[in-house]
Amino acid sequence: MELVKRGFLRACKNHSYLSFELIDDILAPLCANHKTTKPGSKEAIRALVAEINDTISDLGQLLVFIKYPVKAEEYLVYAKTDATPDSVANTGLTAEECQYFSKLLDKIASEEDCHIAWNDAYNDIVLQASSKPLKKSRMQELLQKWIQMGYFMEVTDRIYLGPRSLVELSFYLSSNHADNIKNCTLCKCLVLWDIRCGSCNIQYHRGCIQTYLQRRDICPSCGNLWTTPIRRSIG
């Protein structure tokens, strides 16, 4: 099983973020090659991930499950625990290209709903003290690379903060963009694009408030009766 764990960790690094469907596609041949029983449920996969985390936490790495409302998906994210906007994109890039990542991250995070139009990813982003302005074609290449790495997410014609940014850069985002990005008061983890109280507009993870409301029927923040439907609307 140790060989399976190592192979799966490599796959997590390569993909950056994985759906349960992709996890199954990776584990099926991996376990078959090593003649090991494949985890047969989400609970078994979570247990496998917990075992891997025990071996990599001291190395500044972490595998984290995160629910991502924009895509109505739960992803497993590979993250570095010491990451900052200045460090996540610096491998093989120029200073201007690294600065573009930081500026783009801040531009998206400063929006009320933390997403921008596709064209805005190239417009009105000023790189300080840059003697070599980035060409739009290079910006497009970098954005596609960072989308593949999970730092940003493309949905229709909008660019959102990606699942990896929400995990790896959560402290930076909640500290520097506190007006738009806050933690769920129930689990203390960052929450975006999720369910809000109809009275006070405080936002929670859908799963967190659903569990909370099994024992009481009021908002944990304002104390008023909870009226927002928990189930997602269809269409």
From Swiss-Prot:
It catalyses: S-ubiquitinyl-[E2 ubiquitin-conjugating enzyme]-L-cysteine + [acceptor protein]-L-lysine = [E2 ubiquitin-conjugating enzyme]-L-cysteine + N(6)-ubiquitinyl-[acceptor protein]-L-lysine. The keyword Transferase applies. Gene3D superfamilies: Winged helix-like DNA-binding domain superfamily/Winged helix DNA-binding domain, Zinc/RING finger domain, C3HC4 (zinc finger). Its EC number is 2.3.2.27. It is found in: Nucleus. A zinc finger (RING-type) spans 181-225. The modification Phosphothreonine is found at residue 185. Keywords: DNA damage, DNA recombination, DNA repair, Metal-binding, Nucleus, Phosphoprotein, Transferase, Ubl conjugation pathway, Zinc, Zinc-finger. It comes from the Eukaryota. Pfam families: SMC_Nse1, zf-RING-like. One of its GO terms (molecular function) is ubiquitin protein ligase activity. InterPro entries: Nse1 (IPR011513), Nse1_RING_C4HC3-type (IPR014857), WH-like_DNA-bd_sf (IPR036388), Znf_RING/FYVE/PHD (IPR013083). GO terms for cellular component: nucleus; Smc5-Smc6 complex. Component of the Smc5-Smc6 complex which consists at least of Smc5, Smc6, Nse1, Nse2, Nse4 and MAGE. Nse1, Nse4 and MAGE probably form a subcomplex that bridges the head domains of the Smc5-Smc6 heterodimer. Interacts with MAGE and Nse4. PANTHER family: NON-SMC ELEMENT 1-RELATED, NON-STRUCTURAL MAINTENANCE OF CHROMOSOMES ELEMENT 1 HOMOLOG. Belongs to the NSE1 family. Component of the SMC5-SMC6 complex, a complex involved in repair of DNA double-strand breaks by homologous recombination. The complex may promote sister chromatid homologous recombination by recruiting the SMC1-SMC3 cohesin complex to double-strand breaks. This is Non-structural maintenance of chromosomes element 1 homolog. It comes from Drosophila melanogaster.
